[in-house]
């Protein structure tokens, strides 16, 4: 172009070129003509226009197709920035700078995006190949066949029917329940229909439902059968006087009898049977309660270990509520371990607790000398309750004899000093009896015992046959114990003698215990007239008092001799005859051994020592480590004794 080759200066060349060649057919001249009268664009406007064009090109996918135009546009933008205001842009450069945006915005031309050669359009099957076909495309036959199979299988399982026979109509009544409550619950639980047999028909249940539901209902009916068997046997047995036959066809289960006193049957059953039901649920057993006109025997059925647990819970409940222990039969644990049931609680009702002697136990005559049964001329029935210890009338026959009430003196003679006491030496097993805790533990300091207020400076006249108590030197213990009598003078005695011309008697509360525990001292009750009441003074010069642990130098088992000090049996018998039992009076009320103020009316469980007032017993049980002050046995509860 001639206008663009020779331009003497920027202003004149630009003007002359545009005016001298107005009709130039090239489209660039028209653009230059339009741009000539306008002022040169600012650098910011040019950059913005270029950025807009690049955005449009990139949106249309043409950014990579024309890299040369982009470079030229960039260079023209740089040149326009360098020109400034004094030197307008040349027409050629202006044409190059403006041409791409005009071309892009006005005439985009053929779009390469729609060109099949550049990017071919994918077919629809390729796009939706990853999706599963619509179920309708599979045809109605497949769906219909599947639904028919499901319905057919369900229809087959619903039509399951099975007959469940039971032995008798008593079982039907037990399984159906009162007003059908049990069978309704079983229907709802198993989702089945159970047809109960009509009275007079065969006792067969008809169960309809799915197979697994029918099996579950059958198991439920048969699992409840053993309870109904027991009830049916009970109704036909005619009472519990003999051995109650156990339920048949129940392998591994056993039935035992738990005999209790008449007066505690209602206590074991509880209000509306709540107690016995709780024991049944806790031990997984079935317990048949005795009728009002039957023997007081509970029939417990279940697995052997569960039956034993139920028996223990029944005995524990009686012990907890009454403070007394049960010896339910000859196979009782308390028979086997040789301990006594010796709580002074039940009064004349103690005859209910008597029992036949166990054939496997040692003969009771061997222990009569130490316990005083033979010495008092009474029958040798083991393990009675000693209810005559409060001076009450002796028990009528055939109640078990009591060494406290059998001789009529309301007291007890240690060591069997009566005329019928056997002489000689007995084995330690024969000498084992309910007073093992009389072995005194003299190693306990005086401040650690509750008997410190009753210490004496003078020797105790009542223990004249015990040189160890009176301060005489004691010989080492030979390890044997004698039963009674004047023979074998050098044999150490197990317990002290208490003869007194005025009729010395005492009351010694006994307790069941597992092992003989040594104690700091033993509470003895003074006689009605021989000993004064305890006032807390520590010196008694003329009257006998309680023994103190600080007076003796060794245990009472180490007494060397008693030939000169032992009184005659005549004196013992005369003392027995002078203190005949009379009606209980206020003078017989015992004082609490802890506070010496309140009346002893509370006992500790499980040892059974009734030596405390209620306040002291509650205070003992409230300690962090509660224990009985007399036997050091852990105490679990304090009970109030009404005698």
UniProtKB/Swiss-Prot annotation:
It comes from the Eukaryota. One of its GO terms (biological process) is mRNA catabolic process. The modification Phosphoserine is found at residue 495. GO terms for cellular component: nucleus; perinuclear region of cytoplasm. SMART domains: KH (SM00322). One of its GO terms (molecular function) is mRNA 3'-UTR binding. Residues 405-418 have a biased composition (Gly residues). Its main location: cytoplasm. A zinc finger (RING-type) spans 592-632. Residues 1-48, 61-92, 357-427, 471-505, 519-583 are annotated as: Disordered. The modification Phosphothreonine is found at residue 491. InterPro entries: KH-I_MEX3_rpt1, KH-I_MEX3_rpt2, KH_dom, KH_dom_type_1, KH_dom_type_1_sf, MEX3, Znf_RING, Znf_RING/FYVE/PHD. It holds the Pfam family zf-C3HC4_3. Residues 18-34, 495-505, 531-556, 567-583 have a biased composition (Low complexity). Transmembrane segments: none annotated. Residues 160-221, 253-314 form the KH domain. Keywords: Cytoplasm, Metal-binding, Nucleus, Phosphoprotein, Repeat, RNA-binding, Zinc, Zinc-finger. It is found in: Cytoplasm; Nucleus. Residues 83-92 have a biased composition (Acidic residues). RNA binding protein, may be involved in post-transcriptional regulatory mechanisms. Binds RNA through its KH domains. This is RNA-binding protein MEX3D. The lineage of its organism: Eukaryota, Metazoa, Chordata, Craniata, Vertebrata. The gene is Mex3d.
